[in-house]
């Protein structure tokens, strides 16, 4: 089964809220079997308008990533995130190997 990936671009408006979001989100990422593949504000942009903190999470499947995203635990963290960040977020299915 192909892996699932959550890719987010977060434009931080309130660093303290972003810190609280990060602390709240990590346990739910782990609880739903996710792992952080990449995260950081220092992405080299070569095309488009991406700016901010880019994060990529890996899950066992696209369905597992969606289960994480819609979980009560993550939605509570997201409520914190929404107070201090603008976000673009997508969940995609990996390639079957």
Regions found by a protein language model. Give the residues of each.
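C-terminal structural segments of small proteins and small subunits
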Residues: 62, 66-90
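Short S/T/G/P-rich N-terminal loop/turn motif that feeds into the first structured element of a domain
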Residues: 1-53, 60-70, 93-97
């Amino acid at each position: 089964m192909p892996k699932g990936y959550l890719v987010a671009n977060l434009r931080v408006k309130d660093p303290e809220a972003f810190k609280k979001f990060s602390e709240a989100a990590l346990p739910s990422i782990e609880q739903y079997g996710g792992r952080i593949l990449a995260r950081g504000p220092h992405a080299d942009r070569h095309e488009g308008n991406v700016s901010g903190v880019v994060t990529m999470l890996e899950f066992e499947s696209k369905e597992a990533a969606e289960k994480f995203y819609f979980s009560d635990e993550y939605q509570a963290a997201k409520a914190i995130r929404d107070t201090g960040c603008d976000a673009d977020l997508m969940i995609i299915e990996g390639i079957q190997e």
